[in-house]
From Swiss-Prot:
One Pfam family it belongs to: UCH
Organism ancestry: Eukaryota, Metazoa, Chordata, Craniata, Vertebrata
Coiled-coil regions, chain positions: none
Swiss-Prot/TrEMBL keywords: Cell cycle, Cytoplasm, Cytoskeleton, Hydrolase, Nucleus, Protease, Thiol protease, Ubl conjugation pathway
Name of the protein in question: Ubiquitin carboxyl-terminal hydrolase 50
Record gene name: Usp50
Length: 390
């Protein structure tokens, strides 16, 4: 299973923060006043920049804020899936989450995790700027592949206006699919004979168009994504009833809502040789995001979502910088993560014009259950793999 633009003239070095903080867009949030002694809380840990790896650090901080995912690794549940097959990425991810939640340091290095990912995707070892959304897809896919198991499940299908339920062949599920996987349903209506067919597609990230160059809301982006499309001319589809290509109307709804829904804003616009970044100020709610208008009525459960993490992007297509805002389940406070720099921020500062990815949860996060750090039951073959890493 596979889950499914940057143009400054000078790439900014990994630790050259001054160039970014001179940008107006980088000064749109304030941290809370620092006390003389900053207490260290679980899950509030900085990450070292290993050379243009801010994209990775921002994604790791967001995943570190997803308590059900963290609990799965801290409790050792992932180890059962690795008894026979060792995934270096998964093992390194588990060790990193443990360090970020149970370690004593204010900052840790993700070098081992980057090395494991880079062994599969060498592009991430080049110390060049990468796209945070693409990195998230790679990480979720690798974790799913390592932790998946086969099971039979029921799938609902809508036929001729009625809902039916049928068994399907074994499906591959994991902690990743249980948390992040949703399903889109496409209703395709032939405009000639009015026959209707349906198609389903799973997703882990929804990439949303931005309908304005200046200012809009998340709801505006969602309405643009889910608006009915008409397929004409070269986009006509084959109608099995008419036995010829016809114009068609396509309506998209959500037929399965995920526990964690990730929105990606299409800020990078590339048309031929012309590249630009859309700097639209997108307003998004911190609480009570209602997706009911976009959910198929048959499966409607009226879930309300609360924001739990944000990935911000500063700069342009070929040279930019990523940071993250994450809500901690222990303190219930928001924190800004800028590589090794960590600071608490007020709720009012979470809304920025630089948001690139939004993580929403339909359930409040609790403090992750965990084993003692000394209780290491990692399989021996995984430990041997770890010893090979730098």
């Amino acid at each position: 299973m596979c889950f499914i633009d940057m143009a400054s003239h000078r790439p900014v070095p990994a630790d050259d923060f001054g160039a970014y903080y001179n940008l107006a867009e980088c000064a749109d949030y304030d941290s809370l006043p620092e006390s003389k002694t900053q207490p260290h809380f679980q899950g509030v840990t900085g990450l070292r920049n290993l050379g243009n790896t801010c994209y990775m650090n921002a994604i790791l901080q967001c995943l570190c804020s997803v308590s059900p995912l963290v609990e799965y690794f801290l409790s050792g549940k992932y180890i059962t899936a690795l008894k026979k097959d060792c995934s270096e990425v998964t093992t390194a991810f588990a060790y990193l989450m443990t360090d970020m939640w149970l370690g004593d340091s204010d900052c840790v290095s993700p070098e081992i995790f980057l090395s494991a990912v880079g062994s599969l995707y060498p592009a991430f070892l080049k110390k060049t700027q990468q796209d945070a959304q693409e990195f998230l897809i790679y990480v979720l896919n690798e974790l799913h592949e390592a932790l998946k198991k086969h099971c039979r499940r029921r799938v609902n299908e809508k036929r001729t206006g009625q809902s039916c339920c049928r068994k399907v062949p074994a499906q591959e599920t994991s902690i990743i699919t249980r948390l992040f996987e949703g399903q889109l349903s496409y209703s395709i209506t032939c405009l000639k004979c009015e026959s209707c067919t349906h198609k389903n597609e799973v997703f882990t990230i929804l990439s949303l168009p931005i309908p304005s160059d200046y200012e809009c809301s998340l709801q505006d982006c969602l309405q643009c994504f889910f608006q009915q499309d008409t397929l004409t001319w070269s986009n006509q589809i084959y109608c099995s009833f008419c036995e010829i290509k016809q114009e068609a109307a396509v309506r998209t709804t959500i037929s399965k809502v995920p526990k964690i829904i990730v929105f990606h804003f299409k800020r990078f616009d590339i048309q031929g040789t012309v590249k630009r970044k859309l700097r639209t100020d997108i307003h998004y709610p911190l609480t009570n995001l209602d997706l009911t208008p976009y959910i198929c009525p048959v499966f409607r459960k009226h879930p309300m979502y609360n924001l739990c993490a944000v990935v911000n992007h500063f700069g342009d297509l070929d040279g930019g910088h990523y940071t993250a805002f994450c809500k901690n389940s222990v303190t219930q406070a928001w924190y800004s993560f800028d590589d090794t720099r960590v600071s608490e921020i007020p709720d009012t500062s979470v809304q920025t014009a630089t948001a690139y990815l939004l993580f929403y949860s339909c359930q409040p996060f609790s403090i992750p259950a965990q084993k003692r750090k000394s209780q290491d039951s990692t399989p021996d073959h995984c430990k041997q793999a770890i010893r090979k890493w730098p």
